[in-house]
Amino acid sequence: MLRHTLRATALFILAIAAVWVAPSYGISKEFDQQYPLAPGGSFELQNVNGTVAVQGWDRDVVEVHAVKIAKHRESDLERVSIEVDAKPTAVSVATHYPPDEGVEVSVEYTIHVPHNARIEHIGTVNGSLRIASVDNVEELHAVNGNIEVFDGGGPLHAHTTNGNVQMEVAHMRDKDGVTAETTNGSVILALPSDTQADLETRCMNGSFSSELPVRMESTLRPREMHGKLGRGGAPIHLRTINGGIRVVILRSTV
């Protein structure tokens, strides 16, 4: 687990470096707050325009660091608000835009949560999601952007329309499952070599491959496959329209 965590942290640092390269035209304003969260507490975040990066850590605290970036007018920064509802067992963050159009502001989030927090939902419309070293991740949703999970646990449901889905699931209980869906993009799922799961894949315009042995059970429709990893167990659903699907072995690194 430590090796996976170190790798996830390194990848997260690289991701954050990419997040903080703001456009040269950007007029920005920062937001920094911390909120206590009880062990096993929940966290959710809804964004509109901008990347969200979440990293697990050893503190029972949620740290929210955000940068609002306006394309044209500094006054637009005040028209986009970051609202937080913080309770001892649940923290919720949301980006709110004014009802009228014409406000070109993005919000880039960097979040730290306890490793054992429950990620209830994280979503954005235009931007990517990156999650690392969180044991319980539930719902991830993007429209135009990639979804990446490193050293994560389920039950995990990730959906994007225009983007790739890449997930490293280091631990998955029998009652958990994984669902990864995209319309225009590829799906890559990394699992431990001893994973026991029921696997269902569907890729309309692309190929499927697996480094783990798959015992084929049926192909109910063209481009759809049902099989088992090991003895079978937790349900895994992988779907894409325009792209390929790969199941690979999760490899430890130092």
Where are the predicted features?
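Intrinsically disordered, low-complexity terminal regions
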Residues: M1-V254
